[in-house]
Every structure is written in C-alpha cells, then in structure tokens.
C-alpha cells in the first residue's frame, strides 16, 4: 500500500484542525496557504489491517522529516526518518512494519493494539533556524466484531401471557447493537422495548406477530457481524383454571367435600395446593379421575384453605384463584371466668362465658336450673346468701345444631359483725372480728 495508490481523501486533519477534532497539540511556522494536512487511509482501521498516514502540502526546500511514536520527540520514541536524497534512518521505536515515503507519508502494516495512539511528525526545512515544524496525529484501532449469538430467558413463551428477554452476546466495547425482526428493523410497538445500550431486547406478552425470527448485529466503525436467527416457540395460552365445590360451608368432621378443577382436558395434568404447598398424600384425601377431583371425607377448622388447583402441560402451568372454606364448628366446651366459687355478701358477682364456635355461639345463663338471661356476661351486684347455687352457662350453634353447657357452684357467706367484750378496769375495749 503506497501513497500514490491511496483512495480519494476522506478525512483531512490540518495542524490547526488537529486541535479541534482530535484535541492534539501542534504548532507551525508555515504560511497559512501551505498548511500541512495528514490524512488517515482508511480513516478507521481494525487490527491486522494496514493504515497509511498520508501527508499533503509539504513545504519546499525540505531537509527531511522524522516520525515519532507518541508526542515526545526523543530518541526512545524515534520510529524512522527520511533525509532528502533518499537516506532512511530507523530508530528504537521502529517495529519493522513501518515504511516512510519520500512525501513524508508513513505506512503501518498489520497494525496491533500497541500501534494505537498518537504519532508525531517533525518536518525540517532547509535554512529554518527554529528547528522545523512539529504536528501530532492519533490512530484509533478497532477490533473486528465477533459473530454474535442470541440468548433467551424463555424460548417457549406462552402466547400473550409471558415476557421474554433476548440478549445479544458477547458484550463488546466500542460497539453498537442492532436488532432485526423478520429481516427488518424492529416495528414500533409497546410489546418491544430495548435497553439503554440496545444489547437487551424485552418482549412483553409475546404474540405470533413478534415470535421471530430475531437477529442481532454488532457494529463498530470498521466491521459488522450478524447472529444466526432465533425464533420463539410460541405455546398456546393455558386457560385460567377455576375450582367448583359442592359445599363452601361444611360442618367440621361431618360433611364430605368434593373439589373439581375446571376445565377438563386430557392434555393437562392437575395439581392441588393448600396454603401455598402441594397437597401431601394422605389416607384422608381421595383424588380420583387423574387428580382433577379432590375429595375430603371430612374437614377440620384447620383446613379452611386457601385451596388452589393448577393445570400443567409439559412446558409449565397456571394456578386458579384461591378458594377458602367457611368451616362450621363448635361450640366447644365453654369456659367460665373467674373460676373461684366463694363470695361474701355485699360483693359483686361478675361472670363471663367463652366458647370457640363458628358462627359465634348463642349464650344463656341459668341459676339452679332457672333461666336468668341471654349473653356472655352475668352480673349481679351486692349478692347475698340467697344467691348461692348452681350457675350454668349454655352455648348453642344454630348452624351446627350443637349445644353444650358448663356449670359451677357459687357459695355466698354472711359478712361477720364486730363483737365487744369487757377486759377489766383500766383496759381498752377491743373489737374482735369473728370470721
């Protein structure tokens, strides 16, 4: 590759232009009508290729010129020089791949990462007492883009129901990413969204129109590579299952329950869930007809749910909305508070009765078998010995038809009165409280 065979100029950088376009230091003492121009051909180069730093508008009466690697013009960074009449001198920075031409252009062959960076050209003019003109030029090196591949979070998404994340691999510095669908640029749709770097493509609610094929392309200024196409295997949408049940208000340990998972299909398998856990195998649980029906011969208050059923195919499944039972139970044996039975005349009697029950139980009180009142509390102020007797709290659940009572004996004693006795002369009277 030589300066005479270079293509037409596509990038010109003058000593003045270097400061603006590449932020490079420069100075010159040539007339403005004869500014030297350096042109990189090609303007962007990839590793393993050749690049020519082509110099234009050289001044007359040159003695020679020197190329340096970097911006320091010392012996260590000296690449090569050209002296008028054809003498070429190589320096310590010469790698064997640089060629200098009589027009000051520098050819670098088979460039590597070490060749990237700035270069300094020092031009020496005959009779120039200032030492010549020095300018700088920067070579940016790009790698060939690798062939990309597409990774997917889910190659078998449910139609409309599931989202998919596509990633263009590998992550490549100084490169841009482009996605194509059916060989065309991505359509404008709310179902497709790109990440900030364009490397990741999100598909929301995949439909047959955006199932693929997808391709991704990695580009940099010197090359572009495209992946193999990827097409999503769009699965049919699973129907939302639901539970039917013969009784939502069963009586504890009495009623038989039958849950059915709908819809019915031989293409699905059925799974039952209780409290978010797969229902364990138990002698109490019957599952006839391919597990679609769940039978509980009896149910307790601890098995209210929630219950869910799931339908599955070989790719995945979907659960129903939860169903919670209203288990009717009780009343259990009531409890009376406080439980002590001895009182004195004049005290207040304040009793409360509690029993576990669903729905809440109905309460009533009797004394010695005679009905007193309805409710959980029994309050009698300033009781007397006439209030001694058998107190009973009865509880009843109209939904279960169960009734049960609890009784206790209350004993009320007389309050003792003070007794006065004479203890003799010059003594105090004493009050003795007889218990």
From Swiss-Prot:
Cross-referenced InterPro entries: CEA_cell_adhesion (IPR050831), Ig-like_dom (IPR007110), Ig-like_dom_sf (IPR036179), Ig-like_fold (IPR013783), Ig_sub (IPR003599), Ig_sub2 (IPR003598), Ig_V-set (IPR013106)
Domain Ig-like V-type: 35-143
First and last residue of the signal peptide: 1-34
Annotated Gene Ontology cellular component terms: extracellular region
Location of this chain's protein in the cell: Secreted
Motif (Cell attachment site): 126-128
SMART domains, A to Z: IG (SM00409), IGc2 (SM00408)
Keywords: Disulfide bond, Glycoprotein, Immunoglobulin domain, Repeat, Secreted, Signal
Protein family: Belongs to the immunoglobulin superfamily. CEA family.
Protein name: Pregnancy-specific beta-1-glycoprotein 6
Gene: PSG6
């Amino acid at each position: 590759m030589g300066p005479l065979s270079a293509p037409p100029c596509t990038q010109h950088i003058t000593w003045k232009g270097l400061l603006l376009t590449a932020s490079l230091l420069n100075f010159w003492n040539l007339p403005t009508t004869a500014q030297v121009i350096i042109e990189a051909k090609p303007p962007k180069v990839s590793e393993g290729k050749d690049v020519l730093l082509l110099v234009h508008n050289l001044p007359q009466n040159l003695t020679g010129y020197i190329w340096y690697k970097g911006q320091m013009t010392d012996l260590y960074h000296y690449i090569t020089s050209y002296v008028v009449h054809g003498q070429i001198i190589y320096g310590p920075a010469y790698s064997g791949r640089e060629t200098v031409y009589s027009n000051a252009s520098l050819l670098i062959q088979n460039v590597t990462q070490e060749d990237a960076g700035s270069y300094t050209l020092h031009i020496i003019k005959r009779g120039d007492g200032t030492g010549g003109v020095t300018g700088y030029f920067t070579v940016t090196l790009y790698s060939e883009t690798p062939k990309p591949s597409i990774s997917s979070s889910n190659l078998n998404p449910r139609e409309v129901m599931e989202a998919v994340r596509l990633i263009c691999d590998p992550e490549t510095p100084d490169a841009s990413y482009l996605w194509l669908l059916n060989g065309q640029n991505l359509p404008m749709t709310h179902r497709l969204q790109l990440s900030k770097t364009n490397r990741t493509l999100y598909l929301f609610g995949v439909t047959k129109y955006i199932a693929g094929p997808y391709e991704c392309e990695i580009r940099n200024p010197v090359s572009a590579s495209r992946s193999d196409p990827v097409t999503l295997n769009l699965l049919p949408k699973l129907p939302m299952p639901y539970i039917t049940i013969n009784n939502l208000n069963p009586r504890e340990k009495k009623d038989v329950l039958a849950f059915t998972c709908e819809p019915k299909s031989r293409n699905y398998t059925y799974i039952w869930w209780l409290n978010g856990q797969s229902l364990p195998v138990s002698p109490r649980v019957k599952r006839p007809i391919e597990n679609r029906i769940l039978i509980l011969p009896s149910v307790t208050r601890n098995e209210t749910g929630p219950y869910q059923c799931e339908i599955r195919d070989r790719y995945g499944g979907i659960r129903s909305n939860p169903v919670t039972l209203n288990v009717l139970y009780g009343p259990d044996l009531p409890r009376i508070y406080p439980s002590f039975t001895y009182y004195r005349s004049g005290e207040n009697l304040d009793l409360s009765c509690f029993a576990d029950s669903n729905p809440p139980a109905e309460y009533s009180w009797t004394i010695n078998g005679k009905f007193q009142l309805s409710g959980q509390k029994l309050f009698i102020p300033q009781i007397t010995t006439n209030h001694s007797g058998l107190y009973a709290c009865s509880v009843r659940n109209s939904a279960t038809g169960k009734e049960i009572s609890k009784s206790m004996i209350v004993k009320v004693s007389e309050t003792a009165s003070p007794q006065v006795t004479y203890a003799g002369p010059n003594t105090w009277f004493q009050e003795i409280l007889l218990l």
